[in-house]
Amino acid sequence: MALQASPLTAPLRLSAQPATKQRYWVIVFAVTLAILAYIDRVAISYAAPLISSDLGLSRSEMGAIFSAFALAYALFEIPGGWLGDRMGPRRVLLRITVWWSVFTAVTGGMWSFGSMFVARFLFGAGEAGCFPNLTKAFTTWLPRQERVRAQGITWMFARWGGAFTPPLVLLVLSFTTWRWAFVLFGALGALWVTAFALWFRDRPRDNPRVNSAELQLIGDAQDGGHGDVPWGKLIRSRSVWLLWAQYFLLSYPWYFYITWLPTYLQSPTGRGLSAGDAAQYAVYPLLFGGFGSLTCGLISSRFDRWTGSIKISRRLISCAGFAGASAFLLLSMRIQDPLWAMVAMGMASFSNDLVMPCAWGSCMDVGGKFAGTLSGSMNMMGNLAGFVAPLVGGFILQSTGDNWNVLLYLMAAVYCGGMICWPFIDSSTSLDCDDARPAAM
């Protein structure tokens, strides 16, 4: 006679069921959106000569168009993250991806400096909420020990998306105009939005493909609901202020790699390379940076187990990253051969991006239910650095007669400032814990 399952045995049999792996689809969606975001963001840099020629734009006007994106991106970081905390990342990501994809396509129809400036500003306003809301989704869908790895993988592909945008843009421009190229890039967003809308839910338990064993593995992450942001706690938290400061100091040198680096490589007072060689070497920081993000994602959980504390492991990795970035940058100045100098600068970027997953992972752990707001405010500081750094760099070069060493020494010093922040950041205490108890690993 067959045994009937009793109420006591049914839960045991259910808990022994192998966990599904649906949570990893969140990482897949994050990676593809990060690549798409960087393609849409960087494409204009490589189409700029054609745009300037067609619209009759001066260098200063083209520079202002670049700044329009950075300014909007910085201004709308906190609202984008706050909306994710209030409404959930699903609704926000769907809306902002449609928004920025539309304005990517609209870029191809602009006819003047003013219209292009407005289009790129509105594009930046939409894309600003991307990474804070992906971080919010990670907070809800991933167990604590997998979050930094997910950030590392996401930022690796984001960097590599930027690195491979130049050949992609050149390929598209080989069979169409710059105007239709932006329409094509904008259309890619519709594919992502459709797939994401069909699969993603704010809470794992609302996705029928996630079984009970995986829900148990995810743990209390899935309970992160929406609520009023505790602005008082946010402003009074030392860790929050230091996360803001370290990200500004991390982003300031990084923007050299994606703004002034090609000019440095071609300048007679820099490396004096041809335009072709400069284009080849300029991708090194993006390529090496991607490996840095991946490395941090792979080693972070091991460091957590080795130290027994996410607070200590994040501090060790981040301090090492800042110190290495400063040291390799100084080393690159001492090397005469351009190839090996760029390898050293690539290692500075590698070290730079060791910090990235730790910073975003700490936003998830410190922010808790309010990870969207915290990560948005942190990323705002990074983009303010992106607004300031090119301006300061231009002033230094103009004041010193293109003395690039002054600029590079300043960047190395800025990295040292970031290293000083991390020993005082506590990644183990969440803002949404009323009793401020350290969060379990």
Regions found by a protein language model. Give the residues of each.
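Extracytoplasmic
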Residues: 25-59, 257-262
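C-terminal ends and interior cores of transmembrane alpha-helices
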Residues: 98-111, 319-336
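Extracytoplasmic gate region of multi-pass secondary transporters
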Residues: 44-45, 237-296, 355-360, 389-390
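Conserved MFS/SLC helix-loop-helix module at the cytosolic interface between two early adjacent transmembrane helices
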Residues: 75-114
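Helix-breaking motifs and short loop linkers at transmembrane-helix boundaries and internal kinks
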Residues: 56, 88, 109-115, 126, ...
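Cytoplasmic helix-loop-helix junction between adjacent transmembrane helices
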Residues: 119-158
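Helix-loop-helix hairpin linking two adjacent transmembrane segments in secondary transporters
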Residues: 154, 158-207
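A membrane-interface helix-boundary motif in multi-pass transporters
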Residues: 174-187, 275, 313-316, 395-414
